[in-house]
Amino acid sequence: MSGDENPASKPTPVQDVQGDGRWMSLHHRFVADSKDKEPEVVFIGDSLVQLMHQCEIWRELFSPLHALNFGIGGDSTQHVLWRLENGELEHIRPKIVVVWVGTNNHGHTAEQVTGGIKAIVQLVNERQPQARVVVLGLLPRGQHPNPLREKNRRVNELVRAALAGHPRAHFLDADPGFVHSDGTISHHDMYDYLHLSRLGYTPVCRALHSLLLRLLTQDQGQGGAPLPEPSP
């Protein structure tokens, strides 16, 4: 399926239905931020990326990596593609780009969402060939079992298979076990059964941080710069 046939992999800006221009303002701010920063790691995605920046664990684990957070609430794969094609990768040379997006692609099939994520990986590989890409798996959502959980699970299966053996891309299952044995998700982990609480972010971020350090260490062994020290 080509990008022309798959709306999830066709770069598209968000329609400004509210009329305040916030999405484009954030995009322009991210482009400006990239002009005077030298990040080791760039995060891009939807609200799960955006809200991570407000948690103490971001400052503990990711600020020492000089990480930039380019998350915008509500974004789908096609919106991230548009942002990446329009300047958010132009002025930086990160070692790793973390991608977490897809749960908002409500009108798209699991196969289409997978195509959108693959298009993002391909674009990052083309624009930032030195960088590794880490794709975080979509989380389960909803207090009780529902079709969106199954769709996200299927996306994860497809993306994992698509990236298997990829030399510069890695899939990380971000779910530490949010679904309990009775099929429910606790509001202590996801306060609205979609977005993570501070408690919910902790295991996700620690697993991601471990992977990032491992990848950065591998690159350091190949002649990269020394790693920054984590915060105490």
From Swiss-Prot:
Main location: cytoplasm
UniProt modified residues of type Phosphoserine: 2
Top enzyme class: hydrolase
Protein name: Platelet-activating factor acetylhydrolase IB subunit alpha1
Known regulation of activity: Beta subunit (PAFAH1B1) inhibits the acetylhydrolase activity of the alpha1/alpha1 catalytic homodimer.
GO CC annotation, single: cytoplasm
Keyword Acetylation found: yes
Enzyme Commission code: 3.1.1.47
Species whose genome carries this gene: Bos taurus
Lineage, uppermost ranks: Eukaryota, Metazoa, Chordata, Craniata, Vertebrata
Gene Ontology biological process terms from the UniProt entry: lipid catabolic process; spermatogenesis
Assembly notes: Forms a catalytic dimer which is either homodimer (alpha1/alpha1 homodimer) or heterodimer with PAFAH1B2 (alpha1/alpha2 heterodimer). Component of the cytosolic (PAF-AH (I)) heterotetrameric enzyme, which is composed of PAFAH1B1 (beta), PAFAH1B2 (alpha2) and PAFAH1B3 (alpha1) subunits. The catalytic activity of the enzyme resides in the alpha1 (PAFAH1B3) and alpha2 (PAFAH1B2) subunits, whereas the beta subunit (PAFAH1B1) has regulatory activity. Trimer formation is not essential for the catalytic activity. Interacts with VLDLR; this interaction may modulate the Reelin pathway.
Keyword Acetylation set for record: yes
Active site residues per record: 47, 192, 195
Catalytic activity from the UniProt record: a 1-O-alkyl-2-acetyl-sn-glycero-3-phosphocholine + H2O = a 1-O-alkyl-sn-glycero-3-phosphocholine + acetate + H(+); 1-O-hexadecyl-2-acetyl-sn-glycero-3-phosphocholine + H2O = 1-O-hexadecyl-sn-glycero-3-phosphocholine + acetate + H(+); 1-O-hexadecyl-2-acetyl-sn-glycero-3-phosphate + H2O = 1-O-hexadecyl-sn-glycero-3-phosphate + acetate + H(+)
Alphabetical keyword list: Acetylation, Cytoplasm, Hydrolase, Lipid degradation, Lipid metabolism, Phosphoprotein
PTM sites of type N-acetylserine: 2
